[in-house]
Amino acid sequence: MKIFHIVSNKEWGGGEQYVYDLSQRQRADGIDVGIFCKPVETIVQKYAETGMDVLPLALGGALDLKSAWQMARVIRNLRIRESEDQSVILHAHNFKDAFTACYARSLAGRKQVRVVMCRHLTRKGKNSWLYRWLYRHLDRLIFDSELSKSEFLSTHPAIDASKLGVVHTSIVVPKEVTPVDIRTRFGIPSDCVIGMYHGRLDPEKGLDTLLDAVALLQDPSFLKDTSHLSPLTSHLLILVGRGSDEYTAHLKQVAADKGISDKVVFAGFVHPVLPYVAAADFGILASTVQEGCPLSPQEYMSQGHPVVVTNNGGQREYVIQEQNGLLVPPGDAQALAGAMARLIDDAPLRQRLGQQAKADFDDHLDYAHYYAQIKTVYGV
């Protein structure tokens, strides 16, 4: 089998890392993997250093026939036999690249070529004549959550339901993760409970609501109303990640205005992030938008930590209320603060939820489980 992943973003991000992890796992299985990507030096270099064939193309979308011709030429030049085990898979990760892949297959005239696409966004399906053509020519369309699939189907796109599937995305976890000593690094006392968010610093991640929640945790009247003793156990929020200079400055100003600057640490971008995740006591995802299968909750779960997440995205398909985490409505600072207060004040609850989170991740969320499912997508 020969697999080509098609990657058309202009900078390295989560999608590129997803393809990197998947391609390396496929190569470990003895599969020949190549990458079609834009001629962006950092992206080309990152993939090429693994030893994979990297083929730069413009990848301009549905009307870019030149890239389709170039891709078709590569396919025609492959030495493949007319047998099932010599199938060629064009694996697209968005619709515009799926168009290019379908054009290339037609131009190459190779019947062994299959086009599959993994949908990593939660969007309504389009139903124009152009997309109806694409749906007919795709072999499989895989969503990262039931939510994403349901949202896509809400507009009744004309696609054969047998082509659709759901595979929850996962993360690659090293065999050993050594926690960073963030307490020493940031001068955090040993008895302080650490809540952590990691990811982009962006308004859609609900970070303003999160800061509102931290402010409520300092309010004796709120704690009294929620049956918590005042003051709470010593606690701190660490924000790991970066965003625009403007929005980062906004968050710091909000923290200052609310008098919680001493309760919030801006750690900036770190890589790898799992050693930081491992050093936290619980994780937080306060996203106000519907994310298909956000990975940050899985990262905390993999390290045996409970999570507080909003209930509006695909995370509710694997974070189960009161079993491995706590769910709250998006944009609800009081509900978020209440859930955080429970984890801050109740160490046995953190331990119970964290143990189940780890068990659930190992049982049905880890990368081995994901990879076993994704292999079936290729249909060979």
Language model features with spans:
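Membrane-interface segments of envelope glycosyltransferases acting on lipid-linked substrates or membrane lipids
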Residues: M1-S230, S234-V380
